[in-house]
Design a protein with these regions (language model features):
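Long amphipathic N-terminal alpha/beta scaffold segment
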Residues: 151-153, 171-177, 186
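Structural detector for short beta-strands of small beta-barrel domains
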Residues: 178-194
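OB-fold/S1-family single-stranded nucleic acid-binding modules
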Residues: 235-262
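Short nucleic-acid-contacting surface segments enriched for D/E, G, S/T with interspersed K/R
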Residues: 214-231
Length: 307
């Protein structure tokens, strides 16, 4: 696929670009594309685990030329269907999701930016780290009058970005909470065709998520379709959506003492509200099912559950 990045009124002059600016531009585009792909495959754009080597080819974008007429950077990249042969794309299709196999790293970058700037978008494929990368695009500008136009021979709607437009993305990014620790109990289901996407069904609702890279898949397999105690991080997205990054899974019996703290007749969220009121605090993540007040050290909790 062929793409063009046009810099209107570049300070370097038509047909020129400072090599240092080119490096910044390439770095941000690559990070946004990678984050957008990770978010579609796993549920969050950035995880603490190791990066999969097989994603390197999928994220490759080649600079094949520089032309005049302002400054025009000519780029080429392959579709994900060509570069990610082992991915079961059907596992990730649902209402409103883009056909991932037909996407390229550049189209992921363009669509992510467009979603963040579009006031009518449901922003399903955005999260705090990815928005932070978009805000970092301001580093690429050298003057207020500059503008970036990204196009794909008419196949994708042209992306138009000015430095001023990044302010609304910064506001959205700042509105999202940081990830929170979470402990919950429920039935753990593995989503079809996926080795890492899961769904936890508890008494207070359903939460989608994914397994941390540090978890042994064969060890976790014994919990499928069974009640279990799940510990990890919950990541927040625009529109109140959330995803759990599962870091540990235990037999439900090992979580009984922890969950016995609940008062009879209270659901999880009600207990959080009560305990925070007793401590004079406030619930900054009210929508999180199964989250606990936070005074317990996470490593201590793991020790209690594994004792």
């Amino acid at each position: 696929m062929k793409y063009e990045i046009k810099i209107d009124k570049p300070v370097e002059g038509n047909g020129h670009i400072d090599l240092r600016r080119l490096v910044q531009l390439a770095d941000i585009i690559s990070k946004v594309a990678e984050g957008a792909l990770q978010l579609r495959l796993r549920g969050v754009s950035i995880t603490a685990g190791r990066k999969q080597a097989k994603l390197d080819d999928a994220l490759r974008i080649d600079l094949v030329g520089v032309k005049k007429g302002s400054t025009r950077l000519m780029l080429e990249c392959a579709t994900l269907g060509e570069t990610l042969k082992g991915i079961q794309f059907d596992a990730f299709r649902h209402e409103g999701q883009l056909q991932l196999a037909e996407q390229t790293p550049m189209s992921l970058f363009m669509n992510t930016f467009s979603d963040a700037l579009d006031g009518t978008s449901n922003k399903e494929f955005l999260d705090k780290p990815l928005l932070n990368q978009l805000v970092a695009f301001k580093k690429v500008f050298r003057a207020p009058e500059e503008a970036f136009r990204v196009s794909n021979e008419g196949r994708t709607k042209e992306l138009f970005v000015k430095k001023e437009s990044l302010k609304q993305i910064a506001v959205l990014e700042e509105s999202l909470p940081e990830p929170e620790r979470i402990v919950l109990q429920g039935t753990v289901d593995l989503l079809q065709h996926s080795s890492s996407r899961i769904r936890v069904k508890g008494p207070d609702g359903v939460m989608d998520g994914f397994l941390s890279d540090d978890l042994d898949r064969s060890e976790v397999a014994r919990f499928w379709t069974k009640e279990a105690t799940v510990m990890g991080l919950v990541h927040f997205k625009p529109g109140g959506r959330r995803t759990i990054e599962v870091q540990r899974i235990f037999p439900v019996e090992q979580g009984e003492d922890y969950f016995a703290k609940q008062r009879k007749g209270e659901n999880v969220e009600q207990q959080i509200e009560r305990q925070l009121r007793e401590k004079g605090g406030r619930n900054t993540a009210k929508s999180v099912v199964g989250q606990w007040p936070g005074d317990e050290d996470f490593d201590l909790l793991i020790g209690q559950l594994t004792a």
